[in-house]
């Protein structure tokens, strides 16, 4: 990835856009090697003088899906499963609970976490196990912010006739009829805005925050969950 980014910079491309934690180190190295180039990193922060770091206010999108969960729940108990109990993930759970309680102040929101290391985001079987426990305890909808561990949550919901909420990208298609909706980060919109800013001369390095007002987060409605 680093060599690819450096090649783009050497050819004069600008801005050069990367996405996520996995590209952060490579983009940082490329930005240091080509200080005259403009780089944009989406969904992660790199403190280089020529990097624009775009982060999403996930709590705002999570508030929306929490409200939807409260409207749909028949048991008045819903669940949240995060990968790790860290601030990056806690904002999803907090926004989700606030949205749910905005609709139903007495709703019960159960919070669980898959693990305490990065592996927690890549353990679908553990995600499924925790989801089954939450469902058996009375939850009828679970929102997972746990990487691929969330796939296990969605599978458990399908197996048990319950509902799940996807995260980051539109996961409605994974189990149509089981995925109530997905809290999406609109990475494409973030990239478009970065390119547009460069085109009209308003691109700036530093920190950019995108929430509902900027079109950065949303909930997914499509043919898989419209009914």
Show the residue positions of the predicted features.
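A residue-level marker of the well-folded mature domains of exported/periplasmic proteins
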Residues: 1-227
């Amino acid at each position: 990835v680093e060599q690819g980014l450096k090649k783009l910079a050497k050819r004069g491309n600008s801005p050069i856009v990367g996405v996520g934690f996995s590209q952060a180190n490579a983009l940082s190295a490329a930005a240091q090697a080509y200080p005259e180039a403009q780089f944009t990193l989406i969904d992660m922060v790199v403190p280089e003088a020529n990097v624009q770091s775009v982060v999403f206010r996930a709590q705002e999108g999570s508030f929306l899906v929490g409200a939807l969960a409260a409207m749909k729940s028949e048991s008045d108990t819903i669940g949240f499963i995060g990968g790790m109990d860290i601030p990056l993930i806690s904002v999803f759970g907090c926004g989700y609970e606030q949205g749910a309680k905005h609709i139903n102040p007495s709703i019960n929101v159960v919070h669980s976490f898959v693990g305490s290391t990065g592996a927690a985001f890549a353990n679908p079987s553990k995600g499924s196990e925790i989801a089954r426990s939450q469902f058996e305890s009375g939850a009828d909808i679970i929102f997972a912010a746990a990487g691929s561990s969330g796939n296990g949550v969605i599978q458990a919901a399908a197996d048990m006739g319950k509902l799940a909420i996807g995260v980051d990208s539109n996961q409605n298609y994974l189990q149509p009829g089981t995925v109530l909706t997905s809290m999406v980060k609109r990475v494409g919109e973030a990239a478009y805005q970065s390119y547009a800013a460069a085109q009209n001369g308003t691109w700036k390095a530093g920190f950019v925050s995108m929430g509902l007002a900027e079109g950065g987060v949303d909930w997914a409605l499509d043919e898989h969950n419209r009914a």
